Amino acid sequence: LGCSCALLPGLSIALLSLGMLALFLDLEHRRQFWRLYVTFKPASPMSWGSWILLLVYPALLGALLLRLPEPIKAAFPSIKNLAAKAFEKPGIVKLVGISNMVLGALLGIYTGILLSSFGARPLWNSSLLGPLFLVSGLSTAAALVHLIAGDPYERVLLAKADNGFLSIELLLLVLFVTGLLSSTAVHIESARLILDGPYAPAFLVFVVGLGIVIPLIIQSLAVNHRIPHTAAAPIMVIAGGFILRLVIVYAGQASHWIRIASAP
């Protein structure tokens, strides 16, 4: 358990920084990004997301401080002493843990809520996008810990947790598609983009099949000791979570009220 606790906060900071860099490079007016942090608009998902991304950093740094990797301890004795003092105080440990859980959940759900706020895209016009992105994020996170964990008990625990997340994710996908198909003609046509349209192969094969169903079968067999644990299942889950976001974003951009409504 110690290995993952020491590695994950630093890895999270590195991956989050890469994502922040990608967001910055995607901005059209990069010199104006600082304006997001001089105000807070409770009704704006973009404002919430900006502040969540900022607040996650100190929470992760706190988690990193509580479980410093050995190379950092050896190189910086003063930080090691500070970490030891912080770890001896249960209140600080509890605060860091709760902060990471709350901010992690908000970070996972806000992207889906942000997309669902764009009513001009029929595919995104669903209240299930937020929970779907959250559960998908939890699933890929469990898969990542499962992948890097060195302790056998930890691998089994994370595989069981991931199986639960994958089952919920599959249910949410079914409800998401069913909601679109039972709505207006515009929503039905937008659903067809991922069911039998240009994004169907990526969605059905790489997200549902290789990203959820097959890993769920493999990990179910592994936790029941039918087959040995393998890195293939968590890798497929992580890849499936990434492709899910690509499909939702690009298929959503391809869905339009006017274009679909005026189609013959």
Predicted stretch roles:
Residues 1-55, 59:
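Membrane helical hairpin/interfacial module
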Residues 3, 226-232:
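Internal alpha-helical transmembrane segments of multi-pass membrane proteins
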Residues 7-11, 161-164, 233-237:
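Junctions where cytoplasmic loops transition into the N-terminal start of transmembrane alpha-helices
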Residues 20-21, 27, 170, 216, ...:
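Conformational gate/switch positions in structured elements
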Residues 44, 54, 59-227, 239:
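Long, contiguous internal "core" modules enriched in hydrophobic/ aromatic residues
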Residues 232-251:
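Final/C-terminal transmembrane alpha-helix of multipass membrane proteins
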Residues 246-264:
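Juxtamembrane boundary at the C-terminal end of a transmembrane helix
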